[in-house]
Amino acid sequence: MNGKIFTLALLPLFAAGANPIQNSSFELGLTGVGTINYHKKAGAENWKSYKAEIDSSTAAHGKNSLKLIMPEPGMECEFSLPEVDTPKAGKYTLSMYVKADRPGKIRLQLNHVAADGVRWDVKFKYVPVTTEWTRVFATWNFKGIGPVSVPNLILDDNPMTLWIDGVQLDEGDTAKPYAPAAGVEAAVSLKGDLDWIYAGKHTLRVHAANYTDTAKTLEVKLNESEADTAFRRNLPPLKVELAPHSAKTVPLDYDFNHYGVSVFSGTVSDGKLNPAAFGVLAKLPDIKLDPEKDFMVGENEPPYMRRHRKERFAAATIFQDTPEKRWELLRASGMRMCRYWLRWMRFEPEEGKIANFPHDDDIAIMKRVGIEPVVMLGDSSISTKKGNENENWFIIKRSRQGKRTYLNTGSVRNFTRMDDWKKHIRDVVSRYKGMVRYFEIMNEPNLYFEPAEYVPYLKAAYETAKEANPDCVIIGICATGDFSGNLGGFIDECGKLGAFKYCDAVSFHPYSAQLDSDAVPAQQQIQQVKAILKKYGAEKLPLWNSELYYIHSLKENTKIMQDRSPVRYLLDGAVSAENALRRYLIDQSNGLAHTLTLSAGQFQNHFYQPRLNVSGSWKYHRAIPAPHMIAGNAFFRFTAGKKCLGPWVPLAGCNGAIYENSDGSQIAAVWAVDEDTHFLFAAQAGVKAFDIFGNEIAAKGTLTAKPVWFVGNDLKKNLTVAPDEIFAVRGIRAIGGDKTVIAIDVLNRSLETQTVQVKPRGVAGKQSAVIPAEASHTFLFPVTEFKKEYTVILSNGKKMQRVTRPVIPVRKSVKSGAVQTTPYGSFRVTALAEGLEFKISVKDDKRGDYEAKTPWNGDGVELFIDSRPFSGLDKGIYNDHVFRVFANPATKSHKASLSTSANLDSSAIRWEIKEKGADYEAVMLIPWKSLKMNAPATLAFDIAVNDSDENKRISSIPWSGDGDNYRNRFNFGTLTLK
């Protein structure tokens, strides 16, 4: 058959836009095309890089086809295109023209995202392929309405050279005659089909194709934009002459002088221009960092690995990248360490049989490219569950299984035999002696073990590793604040058991304090952990942040927590450039040794498939860097080799870090803690300002949550930061009861004491107060009814402000000493001179048991107390003035108990639980001092009674709030004294 038989000239006229797939016949080269080659059971040392190619010697349509090569079995080659809109439920047909150098089969595939943006289906069909051009197709029915689909083709264990052309997606069960997405298409690419470059002059290629029967004089209008820095510039219009059924590539010498992820978009006359994106980074200085002396940024797992199928690992060529190129990109983003999860079950799949893949190859390539490996040991040995792939592994089968873990996954704790554990440590440390110095002992053991259960494993690992390699560094504890993990409590208990004697460094995962806007700011949590180390004489141990996949502001996390859909985990994993940079700066300026926060999958930019909400490690398409990688590039450029002088807080509500060069000049990064609060900065002559990616900006401007870099001398003197407004209304809260009142929380943001007059519109009267610098005051205004929002007028006599804020809804209110009847019985809360007294009577039918770490899952009473309910009204999240108490009656496993949140001393509380059958009465008296109060005052509280039968909580009945009480203090009701 003639290789050109399916030319456009022989096809009927098409309806423009009928085929949603861009560059579907590859006349625009490799623009938009993504390929991945998985090399099964073949590691990085034996890497075979098979790249996608455009072949102009054979085509089914036009002049070009896509050529994929898979020369041997044991591999997989995947080809994918940008996502397309498929908004309707129903049938869709994917078709394409294919031929191969030998008969075989290929897998057509369509990834479809459902309407909720989370659920996705993978539909596939194997079809035969011959040595002649043949049109193949597959039809699938999608029941759920969804926004997008991604066409894929996979060569799976079928060695061949394959040519592809004329890809089309049709609605319905029939493949319509092939037609491109538009009569004219245009796109851009970089010479060499690169996805990222170092700043400077490069060849930008403009591709244009005319699929019509008419000659065209096209005008291509391009613009370059970068979202994080609001950068945009227009390129001069370009004229392109095209004959019928022809394509052309025009090279342009272009200066890429703006750091960031540059998006090229625009228009082409009579057609469609497909957007493209490229990462532009600065070439970093060749500064060699010493992990024993210098702060280093790292990440989790190699950037070219993905688990493939149940029993295999596979190294992947991402589009045109080799492993070295992938690591070059990570090094360009400032990464110098990799936390490598050495999976025991892969390392020793059978007793005494040590596998060399992928561990040997991965570690070898890291050392070759200048990445310090940090090997994490013990992941497979911590837990197991029925049906898990490690259930029949020899280590698990001869280990002792304990109670369930503290995760809601159905897993149980696994206690590996100590002899097996020591042998594994010896095997790994000995094998990589001279290559790997750093070893972390178990991932987040506080979710699986009690301190007394973990410390023996740590001790054994430390002693065994030191015997195998005295020069190795053992990183211990690795506690997490995620999944309600009691990070501080676990570290403290480990300290009591002498754990720090078996650590050369201590790691933690600060999920409970991701940034400085949290209720417990990130820097405060670091100091808390350091205080625990000092308590046990271990203050000289280096402290590492070895994982933090989720880095969000308080506002972002609040929004994410409100999302009940499965999309929540995807929102968690989407990390912005400013948040990653802020965490690096916080960690270094507050004395951490290293920070290895994100995972390799988070370094992908999903530009071509933004709505395909699947895990990043399953969504490699092109090697475009994520924006936070450009921010990491700037971080290294500004800080590597510099002396960190510590944190710098120019003004309340700001945060920063400051550094010193060897010549005495300084570098600083400063930002606003909350994204809704802005400041103004002004740098004196000689001080330069740079944006988050290191582009120079004006020396005067607005300071937001995106850090601004400053370079110059004596920055604390030559840089001014001021609030954009003197006062902030942090929030307005409605208070019910006999008298309805609104509380208005006003903050003086300036560095001077201010006299402020406050007047809410539509409310009688106005009030004044003197507010010290950077302090707040709460104004209480009686109202006849509550509005949804109020406009507040503020004045210091010189300047007037108008601020509109929504009202935090009213909750229940009760007077001190009044008895409240409830579905479970009754309660009374009384503000006594010596403290706050609770008396709760509960009717119960059956006593339920619970785990000691989760008292809320058993029969019992839960108290929520906010001793300052009308201040800090910008944050509903818990703060240091919110307390929790759990009172549980006796069960078959536990005596009657009382436990509290970490900020409340349980020993100061007088309490008693009286039982009568299954019914019980709990009485508690909490001293005012314990609640950080000097005397009785109005406060907020809630009471939830938990009902459990056997080992499962049946219900939880709150008085005022709901199931969000554990994280939202605005749910609590009010206790009034009058």
Regions flagged by a language model, labelled:
Residues 782-978:
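Structural preference for beta-rich elements and adjacent junctions enriched in aromatics
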Residues 203-210, 214-216, 648-685, 692, ...:
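Carbohydrate-binding surface patches
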Residues 327-332, 337-406, 420, 424-429, ...:
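Aromatic-lined substrate-binding rim segments of carbohydrate-active enzymes
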Residues 13-251, 255, 267-270, 274-277, ...:
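Extracellular and organelle-lumenal recognition/adhesion modules and their flexible linkers in secreted
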Residues 451-583, 590:
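Noncatalytic carbohydrate-binding groove/subsite architecture in carbohydrate-active enzymes
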Residues 230-258, 761-787:
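Intrinsically disordered, low-complexity Pro/Gly/Ser/Thr-rich segments with frequent PxxP/GP/PP motifs
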Residues 698-729:
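C-terminal beta-strand-rich structural cap/linker in extracellular carbohydrate-active enzymes
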Residues 550-637, 649-654, 663:
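Aromatic/acidic polysaccharide-binding cleft in carbohydrate-active enzymes
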